[in-house]
Structure formats: structure tokens, C-alpha cells
């Protein structure tokens, strides 16, 4: 039941992120997915695996207990070059990049003049450049946005030194789960990865393949995202998958978009186009922690004045919250109701049954007075009000690496 629910969510809930074109792009691992029996679907203009024969539930649980491999090569990889790269990028994202040490990564968001979120992004200080990863569904939009902002930046001062490089010859493989570190270490002979901090990046030679590895992920588990030359991507994936087989429950097994979605929802992580969009600000999205004290005070990013006002007490009209529902899972768009008046106070943006807790969990936006943890609300499911409780997120404990 959970597997089918997740697949339906991915395929139906936000159709602008799906392509019906016959000219779907394919990652370097496309044929490998098919050899592994994956169910392929169009996603963000790419042909991607939504699940493998084991099913979404088993893939999800294997990542929580062991390790799973995700092909995330559809995401955009960029480098921002030039001596003014930090000044420039701080003019389009909310992150404090001046304070980001070399080799460290940070989640941030691009904002528009209304303070709305254009996309969320991972930014790494790579020393001589900024390494940036953007969402597949927003990649073309983000690239155009960055190019346009570079032109504006240089028009103010022609001596400004900044440029963007698209890393189109690289694939991106994520391996996630509690046993991932020990498995990866077997393929890395020249360095100790047990002392690698969460949200840091290193060059790494994996089984003789030169890669760039970031300790991060989108599941709530420890894990790594590996930027690898596309010509070597299949070999690397096959090496990881060879640590497991159908007869054993350890090692790295393949996981698709379905498990990726249920894992990130349990972990309380946003999906752009569902839980975030260009009308929602970081403050409404409960992402205040993305904005450092310096950036809150100085601003300097699009929509800063609006965001600064929302940071004040009672300045934010709505908040992203977790919701635990006493019944069937709520789908995107289900209304949140005030039990005392039956008036609409918000909407669900993501929902499923948690494979770990077996509860019906959702993310939603509600009017700020109803956002306190423990608040009782109703959720309208198929026209019927179902009792629910505003919950903290994540819905399950995260297991990020701690030194």
C-alpha cells in the first residue's frame, strides 16, 4: 500500500515536474537501472527509476537499516569561479558564504524580490570556486537566473570577476544509510573517512576513480553524494551494488524516487514544488536557520526587507509544520481545518504513511497561531474531517555523522 501511494504522489501530485516528451534525458546509469528491473518514469524531463523489484517499502527500510544507492545525476552541478564569486553569490542566496570554511558545505535558497524561494541549493566552498548543486526540476530556471544575475552584477562594475561553469560531464551518486561509511571505506585506501564531518567535501579516489565526495544527503541518514565522471559512473555504481545481492540483507541496494520521497518526508526535508515555491519565504518555510545573524542584519539578497520583517515577532503569517493524522494519509492539497470553527487554516503539501512509525505523516502550512507543536487540528480527507496534531519534525530521529 505504501509503495503504491508514494508512486501515485510522485506521478500525480505536481505534474509540472513531469515530462510526457519522447525526448527524455537519460543519466549515465539509465541502462543499469533497467538491467536491475527498475520501473522507469518521466521526472523533470529525465527518465528515472521510481522503484526496483523489491518495492518502495523494502528500499526505504534498507536505507534506514543498511545502505541504499540513489542516482541523482539529474540534478544540476555547477561551479562559480572568479575572485568576486562570494560577493556575487551572496547577492542571490541567503547564505553567509564569507564564513563558510574551505571544504565545507551549506544548504541555502535562492530568493526573489518578494522573498519567495526560487530553489533550494547546496553550496560548497571548494577553495578556488563554489561548487553548487541545484534541483533537477529547477535546473534550467536556476541556470538562467544565475546567468542573468551575473550580467547585472558585471553591469554595475565591469571589473567584477565571476563566471559560471556547467559540469555536464559529471554524474552524481548518493549512497545513504548507517553502514555506508564502513562500506565506502573499503574502496578508499589513501584516507580515513571516519573523521570526515557532516556537510564537508573532499577529493577522494574510490576504487581508482577520482571523485569529489560530500558527506550529506536527503534521507536523514549518514551518507555521501559522489560527483563522478559520467564515463566511470556505471563502474562505480556496480562496485557499490556488488556489496549486496538478492540473498543477503546487508550491503548497498538500489533505491528509487519513491523511497527517496518517503525518506525525506520522515526526515522533515522539503521538496521544491511541493513544500517550497516562489511564493513561500524561508521564514514561512521554517528555514530561519539558513540565515545567519550577519545576513539578517545586513540583508543584501533579494527580498531581504520582507524576510527581515517576517523575522520579527508576529511578522510571519504562516508556518511550515509537521502533522500526524489519526487515519489515512493526507495528500497534497488537503485542507487543514480549525476544529472549533471548521474554517480553513492551512493546506497539506506532502504526505504518506511512515514506514518506520506506521503513522500518517504530513507537512503542511498553517496560519501561525495554529503552528505550535501539540495543537489539535482537523484534516479534510475525501471531504471528511480527520483529527490530527501539529508535530515536531523530523518525524523519526536523524542519524547524521557526529564527530
Curated annotation (Swiss-Prot):
Top-level lineage group: Eukaryota
Molecular functions per Gene Ontology: aminomethyltransferase activity; transaminase activity
One Pfam family of this chain: GCV_T_C
Subcellular location: Mitochondrion
Primary localization: mitochondrion
Reactions performed catalytically: N(6)-[(R)-S(8)-aminomethyldihydrolipoyl]-L-lysyl-[protein] + (6S)-5,6,7,8-tetrahydrofolate = N(6)-[(R)-dihydrolipoyl]-L-lysyl-[protein] + (6R)-5,10-methylene-5,6,7,8-tetrahydrofolate + NH4(+)
Keyword set includes Zinc: no
A single cellular component GO annotation: mitochondrion
Enzyme Commission number(s) of this protein: 2.1.2.10
Function recorded in the entry: The glycine cleavage system catalyzes the degradation of glycine.
Protein's name according to its UniProt entry: Aminomethyltransferase, mitochondrial
Amino acid at each position: 500500500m505504501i509503495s503504491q501511494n508514494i508512486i501515485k504522489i510522485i506521478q500525480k501530485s505536481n505534474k509540472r515536474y513531469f515530462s510526457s516528451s519522447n525526448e527524455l534525458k537519460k543519466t549515465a546509469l539509465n541502462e543499469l537501472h533497467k538491467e536491475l528491473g527498475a520501473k522507469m518514469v518521466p521526472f523533470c524531463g529525465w527518465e528515472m527509476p521510481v522503484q526496483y523489484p523489491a518495492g518502495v517499502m523494502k528500499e526505504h527500510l534498507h536505507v534506514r537499516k543498511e545502505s541504499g544507492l540513489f542516482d541523482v545525476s539529474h540534478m544540476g552541478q555547477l561551479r562559480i569561479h572568479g575572485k568576486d564569486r562570494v560577493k556575487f553569490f551572496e547577492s542571490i542566496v541567503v547564505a553567509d558564504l564569507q564564513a563558510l570554511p574551505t571544504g565545507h558545505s551549506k544548504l541555502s535558497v535562492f530568493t526573489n524580490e518578494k522573498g519567495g524561494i526560487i530553489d533550494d541549493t547546496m553550496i560548497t566552498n571548494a577553495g578556488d570556486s563554489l561548487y553548487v548543486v541545484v534541483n533537477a526540476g529547477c535546473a534550467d530556471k536556476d541556470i538562467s537566473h544565475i546567468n542573468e544575475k551575473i550580467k547585472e552584477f558585471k553591469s554595475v562594475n565591469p571589473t567584477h570577476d565571476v563566471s559560471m561553469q556547467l559540469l555536464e560531464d559529471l554524474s552524481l551518486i548518493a549512497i545513504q544509510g548507517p553502514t555506508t561509511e564502513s562500506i565506502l571505506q573499503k574502496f578508499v585506501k589513501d584516507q580515513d573517512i571516519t573523521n570526515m564531518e557532516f556537510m564537508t567535501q573532499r577529493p577522494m579516489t574510490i576504487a581508482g576513480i577520482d571523485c569529489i565526495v560530500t558527506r550529506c544527503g536527503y534521507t536523514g541518514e549518514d551518507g555521501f553524494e559522489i560527483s563522478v565522471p559520467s564515463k566511470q559512473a556505471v563502474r562505480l555504481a556496480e562496485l557499490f551494488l556488488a556489496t549486496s545481492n538478492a540473498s543477503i540483507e546487508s550491503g548497498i541496494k538500489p533505491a528509487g524516487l519513491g523511497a527517496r520521497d518517503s525518506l525525506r518526508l520522515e526526515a522533515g526535508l522539503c521538496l521544491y514544488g511541493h513544500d517550497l515555491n516562489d511564493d513561500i519565504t524561508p521564514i514561512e518555510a521554517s528555514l530561519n536557520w539558513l540565515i545567519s545573524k550577519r545576513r539578517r542584519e545586513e540583508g543584501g539578497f533579494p527580498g531581504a526587507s520582507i524576510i527581515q520583517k517576517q523575522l520579527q515577532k508576529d511578522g510571519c503569517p504562516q508556518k511550515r509544520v509537521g502533522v500526524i493524522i489519526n487515519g489515512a494519509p493526507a495528500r497534497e492539497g488537503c485542507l487543514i481545518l480549525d476544529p472549533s470553527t471548521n474554517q480553513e487554516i492551512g493546506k497539506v503539501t506532502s504526505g504518506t504513511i511512515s514506514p518506520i512509525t506506521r503513522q500518517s505523516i504530513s507537512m503542511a502550512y498553517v496560519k501561525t497561531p495554529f503552528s505550535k507543536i501539540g495543537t489539535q487540528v482537523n484534516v479534510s480527507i475525501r471531504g471528511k474531517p480527520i483529527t490530527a496534531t501539529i508535530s515536531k519534525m523530523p518525524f523519526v530521529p536523524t542519524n547524521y555523522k557526529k564527530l
